[in-house]
Amino acid sequence: AARGRVLAALDAGRGDVYAGDYELEPHVRRCRMHSERLLSREEFLADARGKAVVTPEAVLAETIRAVGTAAGIRVELIDCPNSGTIARLGWEHLQRGQTVRPEELEANYIRHSDAEIFSKPAV
């Protein structure tokens, strides 16, 4: 299993990759986020050089392996989290008192919606 500095990757469509840069500390069951970004595949591959990458998407994993092995990118195909996994993680956070008040939550919109991108300009 991946540990230390890990990039989590999801196919974002349009030739882009959602990339989360995390520090995994399995001995304390903690994860620290460094960044979450939307990158072109080229930017992602450059950023992933020498790092571990995890993804639940087989096609993305194969694409990264095909071009990333020479760059020292290690890819691990992981299971896609299901609702039971999400519930367990949420429960663990609640038990540790790691909660956020609803008014303190911040939405993380990484890119504009298709409607915003493809809408006709106002006249």
Where are these regions (language model features)?
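Glycine-rich phosphate-binding/hydrolytic loop that grips phosphoryl groups
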Residues: 78-107
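Surface "functional belts" at beta-alpha junctions
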Residues: 1-82, 109, 114, 119
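Short, low-complexity, intrinsically disordered N-terminal peptides in bacterial proteins
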Residues: 121-123
